[in-house]
């Protein structure tokens, strides 16, 4: 399953079955790389602004080291796997979900570490488009005499780090819009009743989605109406709660809101216009909230491209949007939604209910945002469909 359809990455890693018949047995290579990808997924939501990388080291058909990028982006997956492998890494094959880095940062280059450990062969799923790497890691490995192969499970590896690549390419995070609606696309009755449209398994999946995103965004209207916490409340996963982001151009959310009151426990950022009340701004800062100034659009509202760029500048690579119909419409209309995670419940609310996405003002079908379905899954009595925006 995909990252979104599968929710939180599986924590049990399957070991490649059987011994390799040769140094480059395709079946064994595939199983080993899939294990590396599963490890990479563990880092999602915790390693930003870095990519999530998994590494499996195999010597004579036996896994001798596993690693994945640790919270905060350090140590890297290769470093962790080499540490666990120790001397057994000499003469081994390393399966890495993304090209090993070759630049100095807070830690030495992973390419150099693989060379120094005596690894004989490196299988890489995907080359790293980061200008600091950009095939230089592969070149360095080959120059040292290591056998290097690329492209195995490249599509899966690309999806894992789609947020990292989006930030590199566009300067903003990958945006996933999560909707939970009736069959006719409503999120509440005409009087605002919305609890609960989906069942408990679907709501658990929504919390799992939060755990694999760097940040979660809602509008001020959602905060004023529902006073949400926006945390991951699955047992044992509270520490994976994402940064809470509130779009609040005039700083209308009160100090009593749970997002504000708990800002020192879970990071909370408020996106506001520079013209917002300075006294309210200071009160939020005193509560531990980070206030991010963004540019206005032509109508005096939040310019969402500017807002997402501001999040990208702060390192956010994966953003989950759970706001109401106005926020969903604004982002979709601006062509800023990259993925849709749509939960449909088997009930009807009717045309007078509140729609999941407010009006676009479209006049022609050719102007409609279009998406490609990636997966569909039954969760309890509900249906989760993942879509990708067509480029």
Segments (PLM) and residue ranges:
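A residue-level detector for well-ordered beta-strand positions
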Residues: 55-56, 179
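Acidic, glycine-enriched active-site microenvironments
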Residues: 12, 27, 52-53, 59-60, ...
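Short, flexible helix/strand-to-coil boundary loops that buttress conserved ligand/catalytic motifs
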Residues: 126, 161, 191
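Zn2+-dependent cytidine deaminase-like catalytic core
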Residues: 57-156, 243, 269, 274-276, ...
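Short capping loops/turns at secondary-structure boundaries
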Residues: 130, 134, 150-153, 168-172, ...
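Enzymes that bind and transform nitrogen-containing heteroaromatic metabolites
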Residues: 3-4, 8-50, 66, 106, ...
């Amino acid at each position: 399953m995909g990252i979104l359809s599968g929710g939180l990455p599986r924590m049990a890693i399957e070991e490649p079955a059987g011994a390799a018949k040769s140094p480059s047995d395709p079946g064994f290579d595939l199983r080993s790389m899939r294990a590396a990808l599963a490890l990479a997924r563990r880092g999602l939501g915790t390693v930003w602004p870095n990519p999530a990388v998994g590494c499996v080291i195999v010597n004579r058909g036996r896994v001798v080291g596993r690693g994945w990028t640790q919270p905060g982006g350090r140590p890297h997956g290769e470093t962790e796997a080499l540490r666990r492998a120790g001397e057994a890494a000499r003469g081994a094959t390393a399966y890495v979900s993304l090209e090993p880095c070759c630049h100095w940062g807070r830690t030495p280059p992973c390419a150099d570490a693989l060379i120094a450990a005596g690894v004989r062969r490196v299988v890489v799923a995907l080359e790293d488009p980061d200008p600091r790497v950009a095939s230089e890691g592969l070149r360095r490995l080959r120059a040292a005499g290591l056998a290097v192969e690329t492209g195995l499970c490249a599509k899966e590896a690309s999806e894992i780090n789609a947020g990292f690549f989006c930030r590199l390419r566009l300067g903003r995070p990958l945006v996933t819009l999560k909707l939970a609606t009736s069959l006719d696309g409503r999120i509440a009755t005409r009087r605002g009743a919305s609890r609960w449209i989906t069942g408990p398994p679907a709501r658990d999946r929504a919390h799992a989605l939060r755990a694999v995103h760097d940040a979660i965004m809602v509008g001020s209207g959602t905060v004023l109406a529902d006073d949400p916490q926006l945390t991951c409340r699955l047992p044992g996963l509270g520490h994976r709660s994402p940064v809470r982001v509130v779009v609040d151009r005039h700083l209308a959310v009160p100090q009593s809101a749970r997002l504000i009151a708990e800002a020192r426990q879970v990071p909370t950022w408020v996106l506001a216009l520079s013209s917002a009340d300075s006294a309210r701004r200071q009160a939020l800062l005193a509560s531990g909230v980070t206030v991010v100034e963004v540019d206005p659009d032509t109508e005096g509202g939040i310019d969402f491209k500017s807002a997402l760029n501001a999040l990208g500048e702060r390192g956010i690579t994966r953003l989950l949007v759970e706001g109401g119909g106005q926020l969903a419409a604004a982002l979709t209309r601006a062509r800023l939604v990259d993925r849709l995670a749509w939960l449909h419940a088997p009930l009807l609310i009717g045309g007078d209910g509140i729609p999941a996405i407010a009006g676009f003002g479209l006049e022609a079908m050719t102007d409609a945002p279009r998406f490609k379905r990636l997966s569909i899954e039954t969760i309890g009595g509900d249906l989760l469909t993942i879509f990708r925006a067509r480029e």
